[in-house]
């Protein structure tokens, strides 16, 4: 600037002051409106922390921090309220994707006399199996690590409950209630997320319970889950011969379609479940029966989404409503 005459610099300064005076602004205010000087030195770190804490988009995080004077707690509360309002608007949207989770927890008697707090996504035995269905709008969200973490936490909460307890008000391992955690996830992923149903199957006295997950996206999580309880066969199981003949004749086809014992074993097509149970009887030296079973498929009964399957249109709609 050494080459610019001082007189010209003075004229520019006077002109600028005059312009600001006419507009009702001081030079200081005009400068502050276009300056980031008010942001603290650790602004990038604050944005990162609030982004991780809230899961909100970076643009929303930064705008809320600026609006609330870079106060982390106030900005988080504002983001939370904004997210809850957005989640409430999305609550009516069709959510038939998601995952079904199944996990086993051993009973106190089978875990050395102390109640087992650790649930397992594999194995089985004397104890209980919990099956939970958590729905989302898209399969993309169902593959999200946060979605799968929440599903596991809900299963853990279900194991800790009594049969008549309310699951939605139960506490998750991370602290909030199941209801609060589901809403928080919906805010983070910006989709409708809902806990649709949950089951708990106990092995019962002398029985064994086993979970199975099909089309697994992660250990214990998939699109379909089933639970089977095996129990010793009562000694007085005497079936009239005439009933056997009726089943074998007129109802044979119906049973092969609808009865578990008549279903073909998936690993050996010529082997039915009842024949498999007979094989198990020889191996253990005791008659064994299927005491009960459960089958849960993700999205079962929800039907197709209204409006057809135009994926591009659906993505455009979600983006416009986000």
Swiss-Prot record:
It comes from the Eukaryota. SUPFAM superfamilies: Elongation factor Ts (EF-Ts), dimerisation domain, UBA-like. One of its GO terms (molecular function) is translation elongation factor activity. Its main location: mitochondrion. Keywords: Elongation factor, Mitochondrion, Protein biosynthesis. InterPro entries: EF-Ts_dimer_sf (IPR036402), Transl_elong_EFTs/EF1B (IPR001816), Transl_elong_EFTs/EF1B_dimer (IPR014039), Transl_elong_Ts_CS (IPR018101), UBA-like_sf (IPR009060). Coiled coil: none annotated. PROSITE patterns: EF_TS_2. It is found in: Mitochondrion. GO terms for cellular component: mitochondrion. Associates with the EF-Tu.GDP complex and induces the exchange of GDP to GTP. It remains bound to the aminoacyl-tRNA.EF-Tu.GTP complex up to the GTP hydrolysis stage on the ribosome. Belongs to the EF-Ts family. This protein may be expected to contain an N-terminal transit peptide but none has been predicted. This is Elongation factor Ts, mitochondrial.
